[in-house]
């Protein structure tokens, strides 16, 4: 089954969970950064950056994603500011088609409110949940520790293989030790 190509400006922004799944090198990071731009700038009720949850697999991927989201928001803000200025500015040479289409959809006179939303998203980007699966689970447990019946210093197990090895070792010693007594 062949799927149609992903269109970053065509994905519905209705409330709910979205999964973007693709092979390595297919543009997932680019697509996610553009979707974040759309989520904080479009619709009747654009989201605040801290309302988003963006989850990936590795710390490096999460850091790269945060950086690419920041760059995408900066690109869009620069385009809006240029469009708000006098004259008809020439588009930058590195303007990609999804961003050009997004800008065209904003109309001939993008609002100052839209620029303000993007500026606020950039200023508050450090509050965004752009993390790994492990980081998301850790934060969720910490935020919900009391409701889950856990202490405030709850932590996820990082060395699971080592811990299993220690348990097997301890069990083995107890069983062998009993057999020789």
Give residue ranges: language-model regions.
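Conserved phosphate/pyrophosphate-binding and hydrolysis machinery centered on Walker-type P-loop NTPases
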Residues: 55, 154-161
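Conserved AAA+ ATPase "sensor/coupling" helix adjacent to the nucleotide-binding pocket
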Residues: 69-72, 167-174
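Conserved small/polar residues in nucleotide/adenosyl-binding loops
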Residues: 179-181
């Amino acid at each position: 089954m062949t799927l149609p190509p992903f269109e970053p400006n065509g994905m519905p922004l209705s409330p709910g969970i979205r999964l973007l799944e693709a092979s390595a090198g297919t543009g997932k990071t680019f697509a996610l950064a553009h979707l974040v731009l759309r989520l904080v700038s479009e619709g009747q009720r654009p989201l605040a950056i801290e309302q988003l949850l963006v989850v990936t697999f590795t710390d490096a991927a999460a850091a790269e994603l945060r950086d690419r989201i920041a760059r995408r928001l900066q690109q869009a803000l620069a385009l809006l500011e240029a469009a708000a200025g006098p004259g008809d500015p020439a588009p930058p040479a590195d303007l990609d088609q999804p961003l050009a289409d997004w800008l065209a959809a904003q109309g001939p006179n993008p609002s100052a409110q839209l620029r303000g939303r993007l500026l606020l998203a950039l200023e508050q980007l450090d509050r965004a949940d752009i993390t790994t699966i492990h980081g998301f689970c850790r934060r969720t447990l910490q935020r919900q520790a009391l409701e889950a019946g856990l202490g405030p210093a709850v932590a996820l197990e990082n060395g699971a293989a080592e811990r299993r090895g220690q348990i097997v070792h301890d069990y083995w010693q107890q069983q062998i030790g009993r057999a020789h007594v």
